[in-house]
Every structure is written in C-alpha cells, then in structure tokens.
C-alpha cells in the first residue's frame, strides 16, 4: 500500500512537471526578440475566400511560424475587421458578409478578423473600457508584423464597427508607424461622445480616417452612434439619425412591450446599416453613392449643398477620395432602403408668384421627372411654408437613373381633411420657371411652363414644365 501511494505521488509530480514544462514552452514561443506577447488576449484569425465564416487559422504574435502556416500574403494589403459590443458572445452575421465582399474586391488581400468576444460580451461600460486593451493588442500585432516580417503598416486598413471603431482608433494611435486607413462604421456614442481624442477614434489615428454615421438619433452621449465628426471625412447617410427600411414605430412598440431586453436587436438595423453601405461600395464599384459636404442636414434637405467644386462631394465607402482637410468634412446623402443603396439627388428651385399676398404652411406636393432613360413619378415632398413672391429650394431624389432631364410635372396635393374654403375655391400660385440641378452629373436645367406662366392650384391637375427654349437661360445655368 505504501509503495502504491509513493508511486501515485511520483506520477502526480511527473504530470505537474510535464504541464509546467509545456506551459513554459508555449510561453517561450510567444516571447520574441525580448518582447513578451502572452498578455495579448485578442485573437487574429486570417480568414480565406473559401471560408469566410470560421476562424480556422490564427496569426499569433510572437509565433513566427503561425504567419506561414496561415499563408499570409506579404506582398498584398491587409484588412483588419474589429467587431463591436455583443450580447450573445458570438460573431454577428455581418462579419462573414464583409469578409466575402473584401475578398471579392481585393482577391489577393489578407482579411483578418479580430476576436475580442469575451471582452465585448460584458456590460456595455465594461466592454467600452476594454477598447483600450483591444487597441493595444491590435497595435502590438501590427508592430510585430512590421518588425518581424518588414510588413509595412501603410498596407493596413482597419475597419471597426461600433465599439470596434474606437478600438481601431486607439490601435492606430499606438502603432510606431501610422496605418494607411481606418474606416469607422457608426462608432459607438455612449462613453465616447465627450471623450478626448486618445480614448476614441480621431483623424490623427491613421493617414486617412473616414466615418459613416447611421444611428445618431437621440441626445449627444445617449445616441447609439457617435454624433460628432471624428474623421477626416464624416458621412451622415439620411442625416445619420435613422435609416430607410428600419421601422422606428415597430422598435418603439417592442421596447414598450418587452422592455430593453431586446434593444440589441432593435438597434441593429440602423446601426448595422453602416456596414452594409460599405459592403455595397465594395460590390457595386461601378456606381458609388455620392455624398455632399454641407454645414447641416437642414441645409442639405433644402438642396443647397449639391456641389462638387473643391472636393465638396465624395464617394461613400471603399472608393472614397482621401481628402485631408484641417477640419472634419461633414457630408450628407440619401439612400434606398435596400442594396444597392445609391440614389440620384436633385435640387429644385421655384418661385411662387401672385398678385395677392398669400401664405400656407406645411404644404404637400408631388413632382414627376421624365428623362431620356426612365421616369420617376409622384415623388412626394413638403414645404414648411409657401408664400407669394418667394423662391423656395428643396431636395428630391430618385431610386433610378432617369438620364438627361426632359420634362417635369408638379402637383399641389389637397389636404386629407375636408375644408370649406378649399371646396368653394382652391388657392393657387403662378410659376414661371423651375430650376433643377442634378447632383450626380452636376448639370443644371431650367424648365418653363408651356404658357408664359403656369397656374398651380391646390388639389387640381398637375402642371407640365418643359425645357426652356431660350438658350441664354440654360447657358447661365451651366
């Protein structure tokens, strides 16, 4: 019995020494050039075009053979995808979609997915704090690749979503040499809206930083996405507050019925739209969506910002022109509800004339555009005020390319409620000319009524306008 006990003790000591030995070897493998990489918790999976879903091969800082084992392409660019906060502790469905789109656009590239799921699954404030550690991990990985393999950070493009955008920014601020580009996909707002630049994404974090803001609804600091500009170019699709196809009414109803337990699902639509807009730019390179620089979304809604002079317009997404101004450029555009998201923007200007002073508020209209390729009919718009002898400018957009404009129709829609005054007499204005500017082509056209002036009456038939025959008018508009 005593000999058996001694044998068991000896066996236990031997097993413990074996485990310690193996752990020591594993630790030794991750000490390279005197640098200890064992504190890195984030994982770096090099996904392949054949398998965009699974993390089958990991690049391990400090383990040089891991890079060869994963068939890293040293002569091509590298995309590093950093996910955001998660409730489930698992990757969301957009990750493989973005990986696949990146490989489709850049087949020879490396697409690395950063796994920080264990840290991202904590309560939001805790996960937000972890972005600093994740950023440090990513920066250490990039610097290690630069030192060990002479892989230039200028070949690296970081793409971060939500909290991942700030982790990308912190990584960019910590690398010894700047990375080429960081794309922030609706960077998280809470805990970051008022944070100093070193703790969040900022223009100094890469040679070029572009940002998409898609869910900034709410007061500053409480909106899901950050409201203030944090890049060289900040684009606010549909004003950045809420995206078409995302039902705000349904979201409010579900929160009222179920509480905030399903808030992760509710915010996904507009928050994640930033990712799908970028994916769209990768897959539909022939027709990039165009955004326009503007001081405010209110001015953009009036159609006052459809200029492309002096870098005032830019492509959304992958093919963006890398304009580095001293101040962040805030840009706006409209989109469709589904991919492809591109629309065609128009500024419309018209003067309402009359002999008697008359003012109406919140008036609904419809405009139809007819072009050489297609037409877009009954586009609704509302003017907050319509007054005699005043000129109004507003923005409309079409979901199809109608080609060169040939003709338009304008209708003043009657009120949905019954009005005795409208029953006896319908208000109206004279409109002589309508000026239209196409944002995508930058062409301007002036339309005239078939008579000298067209009388537009509320609730009556549409009025037709055709291209003015006076060449001097259209020459001035060019």
UniProtKB/Swiss-Prot annotation:
Residues 246-269 are annotated as: Essential for determining substrate specificity. It is a peripheral membrane protein. It catalyses: a triacylglycerol + H2O = a diacylglycerol + a fatty acid + H(+); a 1,2-diacyl-sn-glycero-3-phosphocholine + H2O = a 2-acyl-sn-glycero-3-phosphocholine + a fatty acid + H(+); 1,2,3-tri-(9Z-octadecenoyl)-glycerol + H2O = di-(9Z)-octadecenoylglycerol + (9Z)-octadecenoate + H(+); 1,2-di-(9Z-octadecenoyl)-sn-glycero-3-phosphocholine + H2O = (9Z-octadecenoyl)-sn-glycero-3-phosphocholine + (9Z)-octadecenoate + H(+). The modification 3'-nitrotyrosine is found at residues 124, 194, 346. Transmembrane segments: none annotated. The apolipoprotein APOC2 acts as a coactivator of LPL activity. Ca(2+) binding promotes protein stability and formation of the active homodimer. Interaction with GPIHBP1 protects LPL against inactivation by ANGPTL4. GO terms for molecular function: apolipoprotein binding; heparin binding; lipoprotein lipase activity; metal ion binding; phospholipase A1 activity; triacylglycerol lipase activity. Disulfide bonds join 57-70, 246-269, 294-313, 305-308, 448-468. Its main location: membrane. GO terms for biological process: cholesterol homeostasis; fatty acid biosynthetic process; high-density lipoprotein particle remodeling; response to glucose; triglyceride catabolic process; very-low-density lipoprotein particle remodeling. Ca(2+) binds at residues 197, 200, 202, 205. Glycans are attached at residues 73, 389. Its EC number is 3.1.1.34, 3.1.1.32. Tyrosine nitration after lipopolysaccharide (LPS) challenge down-regulates the lipase activity. Residues 420-424 are annotated as: Important for interaction with lipoprotein particles. Residues 433-437 are annotated as: Important for heparin binding. It is found in: Cell membrane; Secreted; Secreted, Extracellular space, Extracellular matrix. It holds the Pfam family Lipase. Residues 344-467 form the PLAT domain. Belongs to the AB hydrolase superfamily. Lipase family. Key enzyme in triglyceride metabolism. Catalyzes the hydrolysis of triglycerides from circulating chylomicrons and very low density lipoproteins (VLDL), and thereby plays an important role in lipid clearance from the blood stream, lipid utilization and storage. Although it has both phospholipase and triglyceride lipase activities it is primarily a triglyceride lipase with low but detectable phospholipase activity. Mediates margination of triglyceride-rich lipoprotein particles in capillaries. This is Lipoprotein lipase. It comes from Sus scrofa (Pig). The gene is LPL.
């Amino acid at each position: 019995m005593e000999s058996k006990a001694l044998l068991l003790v000896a066996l236990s000591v031997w097993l413990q020494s074996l485990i310690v030995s193996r752990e020591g070897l594993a630790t030794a493998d991750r000490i390279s050039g005197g640098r200890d990489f064992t504190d890195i918790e984030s994982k770096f999976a090099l996904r392949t075009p054949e398998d965009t879903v699974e993390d089958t091969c990991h690049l391990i800082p400090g383990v040089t053979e891991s890079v060869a084992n994963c068939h890293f392409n040293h002569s091509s660019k590298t995309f590093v995808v950093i996910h955001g906060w998660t409730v489930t502790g698992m990757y969301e469905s957009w990750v493989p979609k973005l990986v696949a789109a990146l490989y489709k656009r850049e087949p020879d590239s490396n697409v690395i997915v950063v796994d920080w799921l264990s840290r991202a699954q904590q309560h939001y404030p805790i996960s937000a704090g972890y972005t600093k550690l994740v950023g440090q991990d990513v920066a250490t990985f990039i610097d290690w690749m630069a030192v060990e393999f002479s892989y230039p950070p200028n070949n690296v493009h970081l793409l971060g979503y939500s909290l991942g955008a700030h982790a990308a920014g912190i990584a960019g601020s910590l690398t010894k040499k700047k990375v080429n580009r960081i794309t922030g996909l609706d960077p998280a707002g809470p805990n970051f809206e008022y944070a100093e630049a070193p703790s969040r994404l900022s223009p100094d974090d890469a040679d070029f930083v572009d940002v998409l803001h898609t869910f900034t609804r709410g007061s500053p600091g409480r909106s899901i996405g950050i409201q203030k500009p944090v890049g060289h170019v900040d684009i606010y699709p549909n004003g950045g507050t809420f995206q078409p196809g995302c039902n705000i009414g349904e979201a409010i109803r579900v929160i009222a019925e179920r509480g905030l337990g399903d808030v992760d699902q509710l915010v996904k639509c507009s928050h994640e739209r930033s990712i799908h807009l970028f994916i769209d730019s990768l897959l539909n390179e022939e027709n990039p969506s165009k955004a326009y620089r503007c001081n405010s979304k209110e001015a953009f809604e009036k159609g006052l910002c459809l200029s492309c002079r002096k870098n005032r317009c830019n492509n959304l997404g992958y093919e963006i022109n890398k304009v580095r101004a001293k101040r962040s450029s805030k840009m706006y555009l409209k989109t469709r509800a589904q991919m492809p998201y591109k629309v065609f923007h128009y500024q419309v200007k018209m003067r309402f004339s009359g002999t008697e002073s008359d003012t109406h508020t919140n008036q609904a209209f419809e405009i139809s555009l007819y072009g050489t390729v297609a037409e877009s009919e009954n586009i609704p718009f509302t003017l907050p005020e319509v007054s005699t002898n005043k000129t109004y400018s507003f923005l409309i957009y079409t979901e199809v390319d109608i080609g060169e404009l040939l003709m338009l129709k304008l209708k003043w829609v009657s009120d949905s409620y019954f009005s005795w005054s409208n029953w006896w007499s319908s208000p109206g204005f004279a409109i002589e000319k309508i000026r239209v500017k196409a944002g995508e082509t930058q062409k301007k056209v002036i339309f005239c009524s078939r008579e000298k002036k067209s009388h537009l009456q509320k609730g009556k038939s549409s009025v037709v306008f055709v291209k003015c025959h006076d060449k001097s008018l259209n020459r001035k508009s060019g």
